[in-house]
Amino acid sequence: MNLKTVSGSAVELSEVAFGREFNEALVHQVVTAYLAGGRQGTRAHKSRADVSGGGKKPFRQKGTGRARAGSIRSPIWVGGGKTFAARPQDWSQKVNRKMYRGAMQCILAELVRQDRLVLVEEFAVAAPKTKELLAKLNDLNAARALIVTDAVDENLYLAARNLPHVDVVDATAIDPVSLIAFDKVVMSVAAAKKIEVELG
């Protein structure tokens, strides 16, 4: 497929990587799995079995006038355990490589259809200056943008570090959530070619 850069020059890119029909169910599944994989899963509470003490019956069964009790660590007592105590859990979901690649292709193709993918010949800043980067992004009408480069550019990374709605990633490190989260994806032609090889 033929795409145009901001300067107007044509770029030939794979129909497979940048022109696939959108599959909402697939994208939803992959994005959900990606977010689930990011969960720490270390949440833990103490049940009545975990709380220290409570082995002895606090008072006799009958004759006190009180409700019967077998332990001072019952969940209905102050200082007792939690009824359904949370346990550490692995939240990760299995996603096949083919599904992941398919979802990435769907997202990139949808970015193209929605005019949210901005192709540039090259995207760099002379010095790590936020002001300079902001001016470039404003020229591209991309205030909230993910910048995808073909290689790690320290100047660009440092210039974008202080901008809350701008992120810089290498073409090999893009993920489905980042591509969806930003209003625009500013991508160099070299990065697009790199992605084409990965997903094509």
Curated annotation (Swiss-Prot):
Keywords: Ribonucleoprotein, Ribosomal protein, RNA-binding, rRNA-binding
GO biological process assignments: translation
Signal peptide boundaries: none
GO molecular function, one term: structural constituent of ribosome
Region (Disordered): 42-65
SUPFAM superfamilies in UniProt: Ribosomal protein L4 (SSF52166)
Keyword 4Fe-4S: no
Cross-referenced InterPro entries: Ribosomal_uL4, Ribosomal_uL4-like, Ribosomal_uL4_dom_sf
Name used for this protein in its record: Large ribosomal subunit protein uL4
